[in-house]
Amino acid sequence: MATAADVDAEIQQALTNEVKLFNRWTYDDVTVTDISLVDYIGVQAAKHATFVPHTAGRYSVKRFRKAQCPIVERLTNSLMMHGRNNGKKLMAVRIVKHAMEIIHLLSDLNPIQVIIDAIVNSGPREDATRIGSAGVVRRQAVDISPLRRVNQAIFLITTGAREAAFRNIKTIAECLADELINAAKGSSNSYAIKKKDEIERVAKANR
């Protein structure tokens, strides 16, 4: 029979165990390769390490606070788009979990690292904005802020996965895994990479 000391030792061991996403994927060896996005991809601080991508934080209350949101949770929240999916966080979490398992099987890498690489590669660095009023409107190329790069990357990745899964025998989790792997490689098979290149090409033409 276990003594009180043994129980205390077990509790201490449980407390000292590292936090892993879905109790499988570690945050320790994850790095953000783009120095400009380090502050906007929430993955390296201790507060960003969570077991489940659902912190129930009030990130929309203040400007720029969403940069503090764990990056996997931002991806999860972005899946809850198109009226019929609104508010179905459990469904979105399940999709992300399955997608991460598929990524690990296909690439043998840490899925968190693959997600970060995909976001770094998918964020456009230059865009064209409309300048002028009252009829005379011209496009002008502008640089994109780091936070908007992250926002755009997440939006493009989830949009690509959603469109690929529509009327397709593949599940949304499989399509999300494919999209993330291709985006992490920088492959033009990725919807997000294609859109990013298109945005940058239009901006370059309007310099």
From Swiss-Prot:
SUPFAM superfamilies: Ribosomal protein S7. InterPro entries: Ribosomal_uS7, Ribosomal_uS7_CS, Ribosomal_uS7_dom, Ribosomal_uS7_dom_sf, Ribosomal_uS7_euk/arc. Expressed in root tips, lateral root primordia, leaf primordia, shoot apical meristem and vasculature of cotyledons. Keywords: Acetylation, Ribonucleoprotein, Ribosomal protein. One of its GO terms (biological process) is translation. PROSITE patterns: RIBOSOMAL_S7. GO terms for cellular component: cytosol; cytosolic ribosome; plant-type cell wall; plant-type vacuole; plasmodesma; small ribosomal subunit. One of its GO terms (molecular function) is mRNA binding. Disulfide bonds: none annotated. Signal peptide: none annotated. The modification N-acetylalanine is found at A2. It comes from the Eukaryota. Pfam families: Ribosomal_S7. Disruption phenotype: Embryonic lethality when homozygous, due to cell division arrest at early embryonic development stage. PANTHER family: RIBOSOMAL PROTEIN S7. Belongs to the universal ribosomal protein uS7 family. This is Small ribosomal subunit protein uS7y. It comes from Arabidopsis thaliana.
